[in-house]
Amino acid sequence: MKKLVLCVSILAVILSGVALTQLSTDSPSNIQVAERPVGG
């Protein structure tokens, strides 16, 4: 079970990284706003 969770988590990290790179290339402004803390 632990191996399964590890595989899923690694896949999620890779997918999120790819999605972030694609979004940053499409709209860098949205990424900058998302990375900023809500408090300012």
Swiss-Prot record:
Outcome of gene disruption: Deletion of the gene results in decreased expression of genes activated by ComA, and significantly changes the expression of 40 operons.
Proregion positions: 1-34, 40
Note: CSF, PhrF and PhrK stimulate ComA-dependent gene expression to different levels and are all required for full expression of genes activated by ComA.
NCBIfam families: phero_PhrK_fam (NF038040), Phr_nterm (TIGR04429)
Superkingdom of the organism of origin: Bacteria
InterPro entries: Phr_regulator (IPR053652), RapG/K_inhib (IPR030968)
Subcellular location: Secreted; Cytoplasm
Keywords: Competence, Cytoplasm, Secreted
Biological process annotations from GO: establishment of competence for transformation
Name of the protein this chain belongs to: RapK inhibitor
Entry keyword annotation includes Cytoplasm: yes
Record's function text: Signaling molecule involved in the regulation of genetic competence development. Secreted during production, but the mature peptide acts intracellularly, indicating that it needs to be imported into the cell to function. Stimulates expression of the genes controlled by ComA, a transcriptional factor that regulates the development of genetic competence. Acts by inhibiting RapK, which regulates the activity of ComA.
Family, as annotated: Belongs to the Phr family.
Species this chain originates from: Bacillus subtilis (strain 168)
GO CC, alphabetical: cytoplasm; extracellular region
Post-translational modification: Contains a predicted signal peptide cleavage site in the N-terminal region, however the propeptide is probably only subject to processing events at the ends of the mature peptide.
